[in-house]
């Protein structure tokens, strides 16, 4: 779990702070693909310190992580949503209150089960 220490208290003793310059590699051809990297990083990446609160807390699932396979897809994070009904780019998003509740209770190795979408 990663968190913004300038915005939220450490949600769990094992949570790691998101530092200035922390990035997440989404460059599938690079050796650091699907890993936390530091700026400057010349390949495709996502900034973990955002101006909005979406990444104030990030829970990292084991989807194609920590050993990434090219073509299997980027990491799936659990993070804060923009609001009800707003999609993510492949992650799982929660209200801030629900994310804080989850973050305060999970441990490394906690199993996350994502059910298939219900048919209309």
Model-identified regions with their sequence ranges:
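Cell wall/extracellular polymer interaction/catalysis modules
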Residues: 1-88, 99-120
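Conserved "landmark" site that anchors the functional core of diverse proteins
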Residues: 95
């Amino acid at each position: 779990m990663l968190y913004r220490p300038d915005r939220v208290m450490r949600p769990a003793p094992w949570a790691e702070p998101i530092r200035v310059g922390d990035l997440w590699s989404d460059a599938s051809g690079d050796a650091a693909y699907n890993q936390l990297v530091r700026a400057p990083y010349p390949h495709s990446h996502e900034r973990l310190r955002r101006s909005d609160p979406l990444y104030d807390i990030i829970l990292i699932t084991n989807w194609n992580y920590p050993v990434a396979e090219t073509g299997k897809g980027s990491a799936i994070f659990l993070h804060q949503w923009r609001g009800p009904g707003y999609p993510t780019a492949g992650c799982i998003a929660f209200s801030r209150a629900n994310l804080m509740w989850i973050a305060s209770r999970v441990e490394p190795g906690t199993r996350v089960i994502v059910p298939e979408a219900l048919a209309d």
